[in-house]
């Protein structure tokens, strides 16, 4: 009997707790509704500020939207409201809308002291939309472009080191994507396409720490392509491999991979000799 009473007591307490939470939620909704219905715009602005400071960004956003028309003639107040409104979107993770709002802020308040910050945050919003390397990198490319514009526009900014780091990070992501695409061609046996893709990768990222690896993959790709070609084309394609090997030696004389490149040079040279000898034998 005692256990039954304990169960009833806990059930009652749980019910009270749920009821209290529901009441608080309804109260919050009613409170926001009352604020929006008010004709006291200074009060509305204070409440929006309170929501913003306490990180209730959805509510702050709604109130800011409501008071925009009233404060448009008060330049200083309107700038402050627009600034915080843009950050509401950013802080809610709505980076696409935030980027547009940061850009719009700069266009609306071109002489604002916050323009530099907004310019950076616009570029940073593109960066926040940048996906993993396997996916479409449109936003990554936009992040690089807008960060570079920021650096050029604000050469004395304290944010430039961070901007450069972001550009480097985004370029590294593009490099990974291009490498995986080139490697996929190679793994699928599409060796000519792989050679072209690895060459493009090397041209796009000549300062990469893996540049010698990419060049070796160019050599490997064209070597395999030559081996699979019809006999009439093999000499010319092995000659291309030799040219790539010589470029490797010129560009990466200290590379630990130079031995492999020289081995492909030797193999290609020998293959050309064999092909030439066979042609001599078959010539009447």
What are these model-predicted stretches?
Residues 1-16:
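Sec-dependent bacterial lipoprotein signal peptides
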Residues 16-284:
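Acidic, polar-rich low-complexity tracts and alpha-helical solenoid repeat scaffolds
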């Amino acid at each position: 009997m005692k256990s039954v009473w304990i169960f009833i007591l806990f059930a009652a307490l749980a019910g009270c707790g749920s009821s209290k939470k529901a009441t608080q939620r309804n109260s919050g909704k009613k409170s926001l509704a009352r604020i929006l219905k008010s004709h006291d715009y200074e009060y509305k602005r204070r409440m929006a500020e309170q929501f913003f400071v306490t990180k209730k960004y959805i509510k702050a956003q709604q109130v800011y939207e409501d008071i925009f028309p009233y404060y448009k003639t008060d330049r200083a107040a309107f700038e402050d409201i627009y600034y915080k409104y843009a950050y509401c979107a950013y802080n809610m993770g709505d980076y696409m809308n935030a980027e547009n709002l940061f850009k719009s802020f700069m266009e609306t308040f071109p002489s604002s002291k916050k323009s530099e910050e907004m310019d950076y945050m616009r570029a940073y919003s593109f960066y926040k939309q940048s996906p993993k390397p396997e996916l479409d990198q449109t936003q990554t490319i936009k992040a690089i472009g807008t960060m570079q514009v920021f650096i050029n526009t604000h050469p004395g900014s304290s944010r430039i080191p961070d901007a450069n780091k972001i550009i480097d990070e985004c370029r590294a992501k593009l490099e990974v994507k291009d490498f995986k695409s080139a490697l996929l061609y190679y793994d699928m046996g599409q060796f000519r396409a792989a050679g072209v893709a690895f060459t493009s990768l090397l041209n796009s990222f000549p300062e990469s720490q893996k540049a010698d690896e990419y060049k070796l993959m160019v050599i490997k790709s064209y070597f395999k392509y030559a081996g699979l070609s019809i006999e009439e084309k093999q000499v010319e394609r092995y000659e291309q491999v030799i040219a790539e090997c010589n470029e490797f030696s010129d560009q990466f004389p200290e590379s630990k991979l130079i031995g492999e490149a020289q081995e492909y040079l030797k193999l290609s040279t020998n293959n050309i000799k064999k092909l030439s000898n066979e042609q001599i034998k078959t010539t009447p």
